[in-house]
Regions:
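A short, N-terminal "cap"/entry segment at the start of jelly-roll beta-barrel domains
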Residues: 1-26, 39-40
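Amphipathic alpha-helical segments enriched in hydrophobic/aromatic residues interleaved with Lys/Arg
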Residues: 2, 111-134
Length: 134
């Protein structure tokens, strides 16, 4: 995602988020997340989803591992996971903005079967959560 695309997505998330919190969109399973301030560590269970940060920074703890991600990076949770999340960069002028897309594992499995693409596991023994660049 280039800088112009990131800014455009940030403007859209800000526009469709009336205040702090998770905001549903007209598309089922797609949510906009906005926070105007950093928060304390918040225990929760991440469900299978893809989260793309477009503004701000977040830290997620899974047992003894720390996953930190920032604009133009994403976090994927592939299974239900007990984590502790914390937004570590946000303000009223530059709120934390994130696009969350829920993953339907049943649909993904069907899609993989229909495409008949070969499965290549290049990373053995990986956790059910990972961060990458958009």
């Amino acid at each position: 995602m280039n800088e112009a695309q990131r800014k455009e997505l940030a403007n859209l998330i800000d526009k469709f988020s009336s205040g702090n919190g998770i905001h549903s969109t007209a598309i089922t399973g797609v949510n906009c997340i906005k926070l105007n301030e950093i928060n304390d560590r918040l225990p929760s269970v991440y469900t299978p989803s893809l989260c793309v940060i477009v503004q701000g920074k977040k830290r997620v703890l899974l047992e003894d591992e720390i996953y930190q991600y920032q604009p133009s990076e994403y976090l994927v949770a592939s299974v239900d996971l007990p984590v502790i999340g914390q937004v570590i960069e946000a303000s009223k002028d530059k709120p934390y903005l994130c696009l969350q897309i829920e993953l339907d594992l049943h649909q993904l499995t069907e899609l993989m079967a229909q495409t008949r693409l070969p499965f290549k596991n290049k990373i053995p023994n990986q956790r059910g959560i990972f961060v990458g660049d958009v």
